[in-house]
């Protein structure tokens, strides 16, 4: 097993980076784990998990007398771990450690692989594509995003595919099944091993709150959003087989409850349902009583999820009593991602082995105008990798009078908010901190003060900030941290928060009501087993109606940033959508590159889309010390100039 190809360790939403020339988390050859942080102003540093295989009991790191702190932990149990750092008793998010979206926040993660299991590794097999697709929700008018996996060969072939709609758990979002779940790598490996039917997989954000809606356990009317917005979008924009025989729905935890509810409400639309760590197993009774035949009903849990297992056993007996089949599975583990990866792997192998007769049973999406969006709303300001269409909520677990889940989602305070007068309001929850400050992109340091209104928070309003994009570095007791309740990007060779201040005379980068293109993530392995991800933008309708011109523009990022920064900091997709929508440009593909991208990789990418090596290529590079605001302006002029 080659650890270099372990996507779980080396690929994350916001990747890890070197901290004082050391990794924040290192999996040693003997299976132990070493934690490290450079915090020269700290007196004490600790780490702790969330329970389960990584205890919530804090582990103290030892100072190395050179500003760093480290600890080596033996016999660390395999799993993907959410965890926390504590600097002088203040819980922080480490900007040099890998970050994903979980627990309604940017949260540090790392992985210890299970010996003998490589089903979720990045193997040297043909890789599918993950596409980021925007749609407008008919429920609340928000512009939202789905992550869509298409199998290897999808772009160049004429085949059509069945679709699995796959939902995340509470506190997570549409990014979870890719970055934490590794579902794309699992599918690549299953398809390469001929263990499953090639399929399209759609992962969407399950939060469908309306304005001023009282938020309860099932967050809004996601059922309607899936049926009336997401499925029509997928069937209009992807090569899919239609009809219930070619659709399945599944999810984990909260998502399992949503999947069960959706399948029970619409048995005419889905032929299979997967329930991973089912938190609303009682809804299965509606599926049991349905007159429609479900080809696969899969229920799973970790062996430490005792209450859920009791519910599964009860439902299995009920299915059997009525002469219907169901498949229960139990895996070693708690309520955590390794259980759900194995659940997904096993469920995927069951799917679409039956009659694939098609039926056009979904109406096309009715055009919906998104709400007027500006930079004072979270949807616009926080269009970042881990905060797209953010919820800004936490969860209070509760049960109703029948003992069924009925949790609430109270609002939380935004870490960064741009006010109506274009000031930046910053807030950080750090009740035990001695000092909190922010360092702006221009180098100015602003001290925060303890809030008189919100216990445990530090706050400040900063007037007259620079218009446009601003990096904001939060400091706790002199140590740089990530504010988990604010947008997160990547700069200065680490994760970093940012603020967007409206520009008076420039809006090409804003998220607007227009036809949206797609971002595609293409994966490759080099000869040393290193994995690279390359991001490609194609405009709306690319490949149809002579939209594509065969022209390519390659964007090269700054030395201390990564290629994905073009999406969330450069807002390249928004700029291209808006320029295309106004007829300024047409049919140009964008390849977002690191400084190390090779001509071979560029050639492989363009070949996927049928573009010849001889096609005209333009190059645009962000300066190493250039602000994103300046880069956006220059890029717009550049694109209009080459058209």
Can you name each region flagged by the protein language model?
Residues 2-16, 20-58, 62-435, 439-445, ...:
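Non-catalytic cap/lid and distal C-terminal segments of serine-dependent acyl enzymes
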